[in-house]
Amino acid sequence: MLYLTKIRNAESEFTENEQKIADFLRANVSELQSVSSRQMAKQLGISQSSIVKFAQKLGAQGFTELRMALIGEYSASREKTNAMALHLHSSITSDDSLEVIARKLNREKELALEQTCALFDYARLQKIIEVISKAPFIQITGLGGSALVGRDLSFKLMKIGYRVACEADTHVQATVSQALKKGDVQIAISYSGSKKEIVLCAEAARKQGATVIAITSLADSPLRRLAHFTLDTVSGETEWRSSSMSTRTAQNSVTDLLFVGLVQLNDVESLKMIQRSSELTQRLK
């Protein structure tokens, strides 16, 4: 379940005691084998129940399950570290050669994919695919890089017969949102989940009775609280990156999975439409 990743992405919503626990676990992950919740509570000056509740908040049944999972994650991470050149673990710097930058970016994208896929709740994903498949109309919202991901998904969905709107202009996005109806779906893409334009559109969609599906990070956010369904994405950040590259990689992995899942639901008809689309575009060459 990648608890270290969940801890990192949920930090903004931790209480003071929860932050103490998170800091301790990360600082001592290599030594957790010999740490009990009682010892930890005493050292941090908090109650054992606080530690158990923290573990449950992350999705574990209790501290023992969380502790063992963290030990396993640490061991797996060490194995990967030993297999990679040490200089690939730092952020990209202005002194890096293009070859080193390429290797770092590649690894960053790999991690974004691995961590995002590890967080998938596939039963929930299947339910989301079914909800989208029944929608008379689908709106996709997003800003910046997220808008590019949304536009790509909209083209894919239109290719297999879905009625989709994905407008770049935020005023148009808001206008479409207020016209949605019960049964319609809004797919809101925002890693932060706090962009006011996207939140406004989600509020309008909910008010109209549409189903809101958020593709966002694990952190608590206004969009996450508004959504009927969430699809979690994980992405690291680096100092010398001018664009959210790994974020888009993670988001694309989610949208591509949605698309393939929808094709699978109605494979014969979907493949016919994809073939017709290909034949038509070939005639334009």
From Swiss-Prot:
What SUPFAM superfamilies does UniProt report for this protein, alphabetically?
Homeodomain-like (SSF46689), SIS domain (SSF53697)
DNA-binding region extent: 37-56
| GO BP term, pick one | carbohydrate derivative metabolic process
Keywords of this entry: Carbohydrate metabolism, DNA-binding, Repressor, Transcription, Transcription regulation
Gene3D superfamilies hit by this protein: Glucose-6-phosphate isomerase like protein, domain 1, Winged helix-like DNA-binding domain superfamily/Winged helix DNA-binding domain
**Do you know which CDD domains this protein is assigned to?**
SIS_RpiR
In this chain the HTH rpiR-type domain maps to 1-77
Please describe what this protein does. Represses the expression of the murPQ operon involved in the uptake and degradation of N-acetylmuramic acid (MurNAc). Binds to two adjacent inverted repeats within the operator region. MurNAc 6-phosphate, the substrate of MurQ, is the specific inducer that weakens binding of MurR to the operator.
Per its record, how is this protein called by name? HTH-type transcriptional regulator MurR
Give the organism, scientific name: Escherichia coli (strain ATCC 8739 / DSM 1576 / NBRC 3972 / NCIMB 8545 / WDCM 00012 / Crooks)
Where is the organism placed in the taxonomic lineage, from the top? Answer: Bacteria, Pseudomonadati, Pseudomonadota, Gammaproteobacteria, Enterobacterales
